[in-house]
């Protein structure tokens, strides 16, 4: 069996499961990038998919993806302002989300998901690969 693309793993962990979007993103990134992050780390993200669902909140899956980008690009002892690679990747991810979905807000994305019920909507052109 061929290795799944990142978006396919996200769909695998999220569609038809009890996992929140945040947990699905975490599980997919952890597996895809062989991060070997602990169950304790997963628990840190687990409430995001439940508690961020307000009209003003950012998508929890997006938030987890930003955290994973930071994890993969930050250097030991490096401050935020020094991580230009991470900032560039986050800017590209934000541009993709806004261009493809028109929003990063949870409620608006859920409405899109309801409109496309039964279809898998997380399909970035590059398969969601980070090039670190």
Segments from the language model and where they lie:
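DPxDG-like acidic metal-binding loop motif
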Residues: 63-72
């Amino acid at each position: 069996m061929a290795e799944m693309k990142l978006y396919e793993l996200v769909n695998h962990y999220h569609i038809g499961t009890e996992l929140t979007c945040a947990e699905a993103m975490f599980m997919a990134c952890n597996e895809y990038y062989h991060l070997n992050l602990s169950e304790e780390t997963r628990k840190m993200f687990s409430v995001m998919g439940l508690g961020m669902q307000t009209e003003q909140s950012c998508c929890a899956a997006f938030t987890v993806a930003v955290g994973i980008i930071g994890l993969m690009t930050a250097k030991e002892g490096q401050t935020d302002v020094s991580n230009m690679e991470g900032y560039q990747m986050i800017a590209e991810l934000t541009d993709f989300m806004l261009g493809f979905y028109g929003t990063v807000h949870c409620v608006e994305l859920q409405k899109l998901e309801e409109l496309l019920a039964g279809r898998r909507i997380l399909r970035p052109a590059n398969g969601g690969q980070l090039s670190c």
